[in-house]
């Protein structure tokens, strides 16, 4: 993901790639041949940076995002697995720069979350199936969690799960806000996919989004890099930047 972000930033006429961080390839040139990869964000000269993009893991992101706040640098964060306590800390820390945390930077995925929120009041039952590559370490995905939250906020009249017996424990998935069930699939060959299934008397509605490769996230990431300076504090989701 980091290489794809570097390439997208370098290809954008309004952005300049000034640094990259990856302990596994420190000392090498980045995938665009523009900058030498650093071992740690502490090795980056903060005076050269306006915006930092973080796609790591939650533990590393906590340190990287705090570094941005400490140096007055805007942060665009796509790392999943962050907790509500992290958001509280970030809101307190970002006083001289801004931070965007988004569960998904694919425009279609952002629209899917909005459509699910719109549909929620009209259907008493719903379930989410999220499918990702087999290197994803957290479940459910951040996109699924955000979708659940928005659906639960849009309606409080969800039907109860009728299942009384699970022959295999956990076969009904996990239970999210509003009692909505969520199922996580991890398979080789996948990138990032999500289905939201709604049901009511005599009809169903299925919303689905598929990211077929990582290029699907790049337009959202470069948009965020260019717009984050106009959104004070901590913003959750790409919705505000898209005006939806």
What label would you give each PLM region?
Residues 59-74, 78-101, 106, 110-119:
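Rossmann-fold NAD(P)-binding glycine/threonine-rich loop
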Residues 56:
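Conserved NAD(P)H cofactor-binding loop of Rossmann-fold oxidoreductase domains
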Residues 2-46, 124-244:
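C-terminal substrate-binding/catalytic lobe of Rossmann-fold NAD(P)-dependent oxidoreductases
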Residues 52-53:
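N-terminal Rossmann-like NAD(P) cofactor-binding module of classical short-chain dehydrogenase/reductase
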